[in-house]
């Protein structure tokens, strides 16, 4: 009988995203999650930011991802991948990998860095169009999704700055009643931001969260 066993694993969660073909990683980025995918249960934001190339974990997670990709069967055409790892000090533990684009604003973040849309590239590669027009940016990128809280949404004032690259917010949400986040991708507001390095990105994420919390008004039950 086939069995699957799960165990609790210590560590912070990182993800590696990119494109793979013929045992070669064509393009990739390494990011660290800000909070985790269960954050919606406490109505706290979820996001991630790209780590610096000089960060030793960047190479270590690249090597770990390539090792996984070359051990599993993959199609002949280019595929996107989204891999996740636990990192506990020097210990790296493989969590999972999928031949798909990661959620949240991972695709937007990757495109801002490389000029490559992972979703479109995946579709094109399946019909024989395998051309990558890579234009690497000096910007580091991050994203943050803010789930709804409990109550009727009365008003939202969105943050604006030169480093805010994109904001997703549905204006028709005003007046709607919420009971908090429902799942990991619950997002009332989502920001795509850019910065100079991972510390800069972390500070900007914290700034947006604090500012948005004061500028999103609910009428409690």
Predicted feature locations:
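ATP-dependent carboxylate/phosphate-activation module, predominantly the ATP-grasp catalytic core
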Residues: 7-13, 17-69, 76, 98-126, ...
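A short linear hydrophobic-aromatic micro-motif
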Residues: 2-4, 132-133
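A short beta-turn/loop motif at secondary-structure boundaries
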Residues: 6-11, 86-89, 136-138
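Structural signal for hydrophobic packing residues in well-ordered secondary-structure cores
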Residues: 65, 69-73, 209-212, 216
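Peripheral (often C-terminal) accessory segments that flank ATP-dependent C-N-forming ligase machineries
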Residues: 121-221
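Conserved metal-phosphate-binding beta-hairpin within the catalytic cores
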Residues: 18, 70-108, 135, 145-149, ...
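Short beta-strand-initiation
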Residues: 2-3, 11-14, 80-82, 139
């Amino acid at each position: 009988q086939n069995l699957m066993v799960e165990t609790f694993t210590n560590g912070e969660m990182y993800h590696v995203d990119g494109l793979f073909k013929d045992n070669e990683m064509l393009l990739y980025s390494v990011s660290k999650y800000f909070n985790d995918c269960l954050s919606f249960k406490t109505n706290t934001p979820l996001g991630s930011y790209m780590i610096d190339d000089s960060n030793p974990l960047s190479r270590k997670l690249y090597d770990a991802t390539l090792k996984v990709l070359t051990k599993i069967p993959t199609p002949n055409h280019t595929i996107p991948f989204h891999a996740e790892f636990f990192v506990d000090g020097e210990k790296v533990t493989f969590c999972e990998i999928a031949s798909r684009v990661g959620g949240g604003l991972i695709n937007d973040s990757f495109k801002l860095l490389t000029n490559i849309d992972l979703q479109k590239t995946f579709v094109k590669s399946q019909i024989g169009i395998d051309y990558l027009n890579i234009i690497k940016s000096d910007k580091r990128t991050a994203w943050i999704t803010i789930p709804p809280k409990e109550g009727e949404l009365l008003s939202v004032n969105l943050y604006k700055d030169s480093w805010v690259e994109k904001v997703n917010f549905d204006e028709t949400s005003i007046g709607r009643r919420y009971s908090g986040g429902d799942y990991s991708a619950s997002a009332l507001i989502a920001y795509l931001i850019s910065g100079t390095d991972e510390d800069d990105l972390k500070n900007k994420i914290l700034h947006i969260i604090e500012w948005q919390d004061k500028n999103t008004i609910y009428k409690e039950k």
